[in-house]
Amino acid sequence: RQLLNKTKFNIISLDNYSTGNKKNHIKSKKVKYIKSHTKNISKILELFKKDIHSLFHFGEFSRIYQSFLKMNDCIDSNTIGSNEVFNFCLSNKIKLIYSATSASIGNKGVDKNLSPYAFTKAKNLELLDNLKNWFNFKFEVIYFYNVYGPGQIRKGSMATVIGIFEDQFKKKIPLTIVKPGTQSRRFTHILDTVEACYFGWKKNKCRHYSISHKKSYTIVQVAKMFNSKIKFLSPRAGERYASALTSM
């Protein structure tokens, strides 16, 4: 919506809807929606490539625990698909805005090995830095921190923690927390995240931006804000116990 409201650009959305929902579509003649995988981007956008100014690549597999259960899907999206996106932008001199994750930079970078998700995202950052050195590739990197707000996924295996709490609250059932519950997270509203992405794109500085609230909250603290009963679940693989925030 920021781009629609503040620019004259037309927008093409490429999504395989593995987690996306068509109910979130914006009704506008300036927006074209295409259902496909990012690994097909060169073929799908062949007719448009000369007219594309910038590409916002936010469509990757983006869950830690689920990446253990669906590792092939994670690699297919984050490694194979993203490589095609990078190559498409590089070949056609298109500016890239890429969403990174705090999961890959925690514990002085060691957390990148905690899960297939964090690992693939970390490797993408290494690749981008090399593409910059090798080919002077232009891009902005935006680090997302537990984004929540309208349109968040509330149900299914890819639901967000706030989305899960919201759904359970509406159903008047106990809020489920993965033990120990003291895991701390920095949460960022979707509107603030979008504003930061727009800022980075407009500034065009080829920089890394870390978008986060200054304060961290434990999962238990967040759950208690709903004034609901709490049910604890067994610990999960790849769980991080603190959000990461570094100087960018």
Per-range role (PLM):
Residues 1-147, 191:
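N-terminal Rossmann-like NAD(P)+-binding domain of SDR-like oxidoreductases, especially those catalyzing
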Residues 22-23, 125, 163, 216, ...:
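Short, surface-exposed alpha-helical segments at coil->helix boundaries
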Residues 44-47, 88, 168, 196, ...:
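CheY-like receiver
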Residues 114-117, 145-159, 179-190, 239:
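Glycine-rich "substrate-gating" loop/helix at the edge of Rossmann-like oxidoreductase active sites
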Residues 63, 101, 124, 157, ...:
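Activation loop
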Residues 169-248:
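C-terminal substrate-binding subdomain of Rossmann-fold SDR/epimerase-dehydratase oxidoreductases
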Residues 108, 150-153, 220:
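Short beta-loop-alpha junction of Rossmann-like oxidoreductase domains
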Residues 123-131, 161, 165, 222, ...:
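Hydrophobic alpha-helix immediately C-terminal to the catalytic Tyr-X-X-X-Lys motif of short-chain
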